[in-house]
Amino acid sequence: MSRFFYGSGSDSDSSSDEEELLTDREEEEKSEEESSEEEEETSEEESSDDEGETGANRFLRDASESEESEDEEKVTVVKSAKDKRLEELEGIIKLIENAEKINDWAVISSEFDKLNRQVVKVTQSGPVPRIYVKAVADLEDFVNETITKQKSAKKMNASNSRGFNAVKQRIKKNNKEYATHIEKYRSDKDGYMEGKEEEAKPAIVAPRLTKVERVVEAPAAATSTDDGFATVGRGGKTLQYTPESILKHLRVIVESRGKKNTDRLEQIKTMEKLLEVAQTPYQRIRVYLTLLSTRFDISSTSSANYMSVDQWKLAEKELAALLSVLETNRDHVVTEGAEEWEDDEKQPQVKPGETLHIPGSIVSHVERLDDELTRSLQHIDPHTAEYIDRLSDEKQLYTNLVRVQAYIEGLVEAEKSDMRQDSLNRVVMRRLEHIYFKPSQVVTILEEGTWKALPSELDSKVTPRGNAGDVTGLVQTLCNYLFTYSDGIIRARAMLCQIYFLALHDQYYRSRDLMLMSHLTENISNFDVNTQILFNRTLVQIGLCAFRAGLIYEAQNTLSEVCGSGRQKELLAQGIILQRYSTVSPEQERLERQRQLPFHMHINLELLECIYLTSSMFLEVPLMAQTSSSPELKRRIISKTFRRMLDYNERQVFTGPAENTRDGVIMSAKFLAAGDWKKAAEMLNSIKIWDLMPQPDKIKEMLSQQIQEEGLRTYLFTYAPFYDSLSISTLSNMFELSEKKIAAIISRMISHEELAAALDQVNDAIVFRKGVELSRLQSQVVTLADKSMNLLEANEKTLEQRTQGMANAFQRDQGAGARGGRGPGRGGQARGGPRLPGGQQGRRPGGQQFSGGALGGAIKA
């Protein structure tokens, strides 16, 4: 009884051991109750049938008795679950043997997987079956024979070759677990197979009143917790976490990655227990690497798109602990491409002077930690305290980045290789991306806190500890290192980060020269989307820097590429514009959302639009005044966005006071165009968004000065035709500028041939040249002539379309036979038709004929 109870086990791999024992116990009780009930019912039915057999039923008695006798002859064989599983095991082994005969490795590979899954179920209730040991031993011999036959291996097709390689890789790992059984089998095959199977000792199960009602007596050597309770694994076996079993547990966890119904939280608890019993540095490093990967797997399979805060902080602490172990034990190196240790029974021994290479990637872990923090910031409301708390975790992440950089520097110094150099470049790039957009004061605090948190003996050769206070030198050092040792996208991104940093710190000319010398403007379309976003951010920052420096033309010219499109949010990755009839697929939209920048990296779009419109106003208003007074000049538009907003505002019947930043700039432009520069300056300075810029008083003073200068230019363009001469002192009093400044502005206008005048320095006056500028009447005449020419050209095009280019379209006096139209003699003698009186053959009915209008009359005359 106990054997069947213990061996019933779990028929599905996904059910837990606790539920197996519970359900088995319940099923036995239910089966006993049901059997007793069925016996009672059958006895009652038999008695009722015997009493009720009357009439026709008496004549059917012989037939029923014969059927009962036939049923008694049939013997029903009841097999236990263990026997059924052994039969399934034998069937799989038979298929493998048949496939070996025809050399079908695809079938062998698939059946070998089934065999291993089936043997797990069988071994839950007993020892390893001898037929399984025989099968895997013979299969290993068959693999070795196939390897020796090189020619036959070359003749395999693709599916056969894949199956053979899969079996060859798995058979050695699999047979290590059954090495003792296989040795016994190979030493005496017949004697081994004739021996009897050992019975498994049943576990003693005691009922409990909890959901899991069982207590398994653990061995005395096992470490018990919770008042005598111990962790029990599959088949009721007590799980023992010892230093010798660490690699086996890790192997099971690694092989279960990617499979369904895998409890990763339980795996994490297991690895935390393994950390407690780990003794050697190799064991701790292996556990930390697997533990970090498992924590990151939780976020990839969860419904949330980012890692939870608790899991992230635990992963960050474990990464710091892993780095501490690696810094202490320099003979253990975690590197990509290292060979994996296959023997789980024993651990590798490091001889003095040698280095043990462990497969893994420290850089990938710190990059994943960085990405998870970014995803978390993307999904948190930036206007809450939670965002600020989450942003404070960046300090720990930056500390780990610097620590990983110092560790990889040591590896590169010990052994230079392209792979290690690439890893170092990736870490340096990540570090640069965390500081390039921050002001110097913030970076200084971050650097000082980082070096205080790191061990005192730890230092970096690329960025020494002593240079932490020089932020400009730090950015320059990181960028120069990437310029020297990297290429492609990393070098381009480093260049853009340096340009952004220089522009942020008001070094316009250096940032502009670097942008021009890099030639990134010509090649940016060849880079990935994230680099293009960084390019747009850098371009905008250069424009803002030019505006702060008072370089209005350069600012407007730089910002027009991004702000003129009306898609600032998309181009700067600060939001998604959802269009009604967009053809964007859900996958593209998901990628677009992943590329969005966290809120603390955003550039203020309202401030950006205000600066762009203000710069456009300073250029457009004088240009509009110049073209209105000089219509012979070709009309050109500097900013279509500004013109469109200004035209819309002028079409309004009633305009109220300015309600937002955009309205404030447009109202200021209207005052400036009307010549009232004081109201324009007052309106522009009243915009509150200037307070968000550094040194707002200096910015407002610069804006007032620009309005005075552009107001002077607008006044001269508008009223120059009405003056013979104009005193400079009068202009100085009117615009509150120094006479020297006014003379400089007028000289510049004269040199650029914007103003037909001369500067009389003796009398301090401007002398305008007559005959060059057109009067109002002359301007109107020129405008009328242009419109007449346009009308004439339009009529000529219409004429050619109607007559299809025939020269004799309006020669009516030459008679009916000479009519043009759609062909010679239409409706006349050419087609044999009757000649109509009055030369009216070929005319279309209805009486509506094209006469050419005024142009037709002119041609007929």
From Swiss-Prot:
Its principal location?
cytoplasm
**Domain PCI: from-to ranges:** 599-773
Location(s), subcellular: Cytoplasm
Q: Which Gene3D superfamilies match?
A: Winged helix-like DNA-binding domain superfamily/Winged helix DNA-binding domain
In the record, biological process GO terms are:
formation of cytoplasmic translation initiation complex
Signal peptide feature range: none
Composition-biased stretches (Gly residues):
817-861
- One Pfam match, by short name? PCI
Task: Determine if Cytoplasm is one of this entry's keywords.
Answer: yes
Molecular-function GO term, any one: RNA binding
Where does it sit, as one GO cellular component term? multi-eIF complex
What are the boundaries of the region Disordered?
A: 1-76, 812-861
Q: Which sequence ranges are marked TM in the entry?
A: none
Composition-biased stretches (Acidic residues): 14-53
Answer whether the UniProt record assigns the keyword Protein biosynthesis to this protein. Answer: yes
Alphabetized UniProt keyword annotations: Cytoplasm, Initiation factor, Protein biosynthesis
Q: Which PANTHER family match?
A: EUKARYOTIC TRANSLATION INITATION FACTOR 3, SUBUNIT 8 EIF3S8 -RELATED, EUKARYOTIC TRANSLATION INITIATION FACTOR 3 SUBUNIT C-RELATED
Its quaternary structure?
Component of the eukaryotic translation initiation factor 3 (eIF-3) complex.
Q: Which family does it belong to?
A: Belongs to the eIF-3 subunit C family.
Query: What the protein does?
Result: Component of the eukaryotic translation initiation factor 3 (eIF-3) complex, which is involved in protein synthesis of a specialized repertoire of mRNAs and, together with other initiation factors, stimulates binding of mRNA and methionyl-tRNAi to the 40S ribosome. The eIF-3 complex specifically targets and initiates translation of a subset of mRNAs involved in cell proliferation.
Q: What protein does this entry describe? A: Eukaryotic translation initiation factor 3 subunit C
Q: Species name for this entry?
A: Aspergillus oryzae (strain ATCC 42149 / RIB 40)
